[in-house]
Amino acid sequence: MKFELIANDGAARRGRLSFPRGTVETPAFMPVGTYGTVKAMTPEELEGIGAEIILGNTFHLMLRPGTEVIQLHGDLHDFMHWEKPILTDSGGFQVFSLADLRKITEEGVKFRSPVDGSEILLTPERSMDVQRALGSDIVMIFDECTPYPATEDQARESMELSLRWAARSKVAHGDSPSALFGIVQGGMYPALRSRSLEGLVDVGFDGYAIGGLSVGEGMEERHHVLDHLMPEMPAERPRYLMGVGKPEDIVEAVRRGVDMFDCVIPTRNARNGFLYTREGVMRIRNSRFRTDTGPIDESCDCYTCRNYSRAYLKHLDKCNEILGARLNTIHNLHYYQTLMRELRGAIAEGRLEAWVAEFYGRRSQAVPSVP
């Protein structure tokens, strides 16, 4: 992987990631394909809305169908018919989500499979092996996602364990051609975040992710962490904010220098009738759309908006038709890719803050301040 920084506008960055399987323009949003599919979307539709990289889930694919089935096809790209880059998470966040069903030790995490109840030990070495089998273009280290809320002592202990696992992940990754990203932990404590980043840089990674956010904290807490951490992150490496988020969350993180994002929000919300427009979120289940012949968003040129009315989408949703979920998802992911494209253009042209003012103005919201 090669990362090229093309332009800056304040702290915001316009860049490019280059892989043998293709290039990714940054800032970039990665649709989430948990089980080897971005829900309700074909790979061709993903390409059509402008996605250049997607995310796969190591934990879930390891459990079902298992790497042995995927490797019968080649790797995850072949299995799911996606020819562009794939980033896979390490499984750390999913293990964190199991809560009382897992036991963390120095070696790794023991847990009961949610599929068949068998006991599984997931270690940094095992995570690297699985991600290698998946053929990931970007591999994430195995870490412990610090719980929220956490005391400073709890956050420190968790962060230090993650640093030791990071070093083991690097050794296990070996000479794999895939990029390997470290993950900064440390909870809501700036000094611990700095220590985590320092330790990761000492080990040396191809990119650096910020983990342990979007786990229940408020926006002010998240921005406090980002405002402290972003100026310290290596400028020559890509920066990835994991699991974030809503359009306004992405805009604020881009203003602070983040390059990469992933989140299930656009696809999950699409299946639940929440649609993104330039003015904010539209609830298609609202009764006022029953006879509305207009598109979701007059300014949107996605397949859904070019061909279907709000009334039709409300009808499909009311009847629980699969097509409704598909059309809604096409629109929401198109909105996200358009958002990223506009952010890239604004940064490249040195007019990001003017674009941000327009973004919030259309939503009748004040522009948040950035240090």
From Swiss-Prot:
Its EC number is 2.4.2.29. It catalyses: 7-aminomethyl-7-carbaguanine + guanosine(34) in tRNA = 7-aminomethyl-7-carbaguanosine(34) in tRNA + guanine. Pathway: tRNA modification; tRNA-queuosine biosynthesis. GO terms for biological process: queuosine biosynthetic process; tRNA wobble guanine modification; tRNA-guanine transglycosylation. Zn(2+) binds at residues 300, 302, 305, 331. Residues 243-249, 267-271 are annotated as: RNA binding. Coiled coil: none annotated. Binds 1 zinc ion per subunit. It is an enzyme of class 2 (transferase). One of its GO terms (molecular function) is tRNA-guanosine(34) queuine transglycosylase activity. Homodimer. Within each dimer, one monomer is responsible for RNA recognition and catalysis, while the other monomer binds to the replacement base PreQ1. This is Queuine tRNA-ribosyltransferase.
